[in-house]
Amino acid sequence: MQTFVKGKRVGYWLSEKKIKKLNFQTFVDLCRKQGIEMIQLDLSQPIESQGPFDVIIHKLTDHIVDADQNVTESLLLVQGVQDYIDAHPETVILDPLPAIRTLLDRCKSYKLIHKLEHSMEDDRICSPPFMVLKTECGFETLEQLHKHGITFPFICKPQVAHGTNSHEMAIIFSEEDLKDIKPPCVLQSFINHNAVLYKVFVVGEAYSVVQRPSIRNFPSGPTDRRAISFNSHHVSKPESSSHLTCRDNMVGQSWKPSNEVIQKISRKLHQALGISLFGIDIIINNQTGQHAVIDINAFPGYEGVPEFFDDLLSHISSVLQGQVCNGVACGHLRVNGTAQSQTVHCGMLGNDSSWLMDSEGIKKGPHQGLSCCGGCMTPNFHQHTRSSLTAETSSQ
């Protein structure tokens, strides 16, 4: 680790639940071994008295949601953090509070996805039609669905994309079940994707793709099937197995995610929001092969990503350095745990469509860098590439 990180101070605030789930103390110890001073923030006390900080890492989503609902304690805590940020523009915040607020509102994040889709002008990328429903369904609802290009079946999701209730969803198959929809919520067209979800976990310049179970295929158009309620978190667990995730009715093709497409989407989100720690849920249309972003998550759980701590330390080091490789795209490859000195372009590694199965039974794609180029992912072996996103964005 470079000497420039020694003596740097990094503040962090995560809920106790998040700290335990990530085993974050291991990361704290890793940083301290590299000479980085890690300070757990006490939000009940002025942050000014706990600083100064070169970087602050946080997951304040619970408090931000509560603050937006005028919960006094959370209002004060979030305002305290914002006051420190305003007073210390030199401190790097992972990630910016306005960006987190965007990701906590599915309406805002879906609008952003649509905007980015148009700017990318890539036929391999699509964003499902959606609309926001703020009141109970009425006679005009069908007209609104048609206006927004939403057809049956569609998914009904809570507008707030955080908390236990954010995972409670329903698939609506016909006009008859519109009366059961409880606003405020977001209605999003359902795309058949052969019951496979790809979770993209981004950390600075690196990302990993993990394959998870998802909702099975359903016939297009209205049917007499009753609405199905489900918890998306439970459905997409690695071990999930139910009638909802059954793959017996697979049709079309089972497409693998395109490395180039995922890099493009990740870079655009990074550029638009200035975020570094986020997850992207992607499904692939089983007829067209188009990649559809169906959700974006702030500071996800990184389950199935053993490189998370290494990537986070690398990103913090790059942030502290103030640049990445002097603006030149660079990277290293890790094969079976052994670091290689060469710069790697993802397209050099072939187009094998197999996926690795880790010790926990989680199906995974290779670990990539955002600046790599190439086509489909190539999981012949475990790949770990870091490259400079700064170099990519500076030329655009």
UniProtKB/Swiss-Prot annotation:
Residue sites binding Mg(2+) 1 per the record: D281, D295
Domain ATP-grasp: 117-325
Quaternary structure, from the entry: Monomer.
Enzyme Commission number(s) from the entry: 2.7.1.134, 2.7.1.159
InterPro entries hit by this protein: ATP-grasp, Inositol_tetrakis-P_1-kinase, InsP(3)kin_ATP-grasp, ITPK1_N
Cofactor(s) this protein requires: Mg(2+)
GO biological process, one term: necroptotic process
Annotated catalysed reactions: 1D-myo-inositol 3,4,5,6-tetrakisphosphate + ATP = 1D-myo-inositol 1,3,4,5,6-pentakisphosphate + ADP + H(+); 1D-myo-inositol 1,3,4-trisphosphate + ATP = 1D-myo-inositol 1,3,4,5-tetrakisphosphate + ADP + H(+); 1D-myo-inositol 1,3,4-trisphosphate + ATP = 1D-myo-inositol 1,3,4,6-tetrakisphosphate + ADP + H(+); 1D-myo-inositol 3,4,6-trisphosphate + ATP = 1D-myo-inositol 1,3,4,6-tetrakisphosphate + ADP + H(+)
Similarity field: Belongs to the ITPK1 family.
Gene name per UniProt: itpk1
GO molecular function, one term: inositol-1,3,4-trisphosphate 5-kinase activity
Gene3D superfamilies recorded: 3.30.1490.220, 3.40.50.11370, ATP-grasp fold, B domain
Protein name: Inositol-tetrakisphosphate 1-kinase
Cofactor note: Binds 2 magnesium ions per subunit.
Keyword terms: ATP-binding, Isomerase, Kinase, Magnesium, Metal-binding, Nucleotide-binding, Transferase
Annotated organism of origin: Danio rerio (Zebrafish)
Positions annotated to bind 1D-myo-inositol 1,3,4-trisphosphate: K18, H167, K199, N297
Binding site for Mg(2+) 2: D295, N297
Annotated binding of ATP, by residue: 106, 157, 188-199, 214, 232, 236
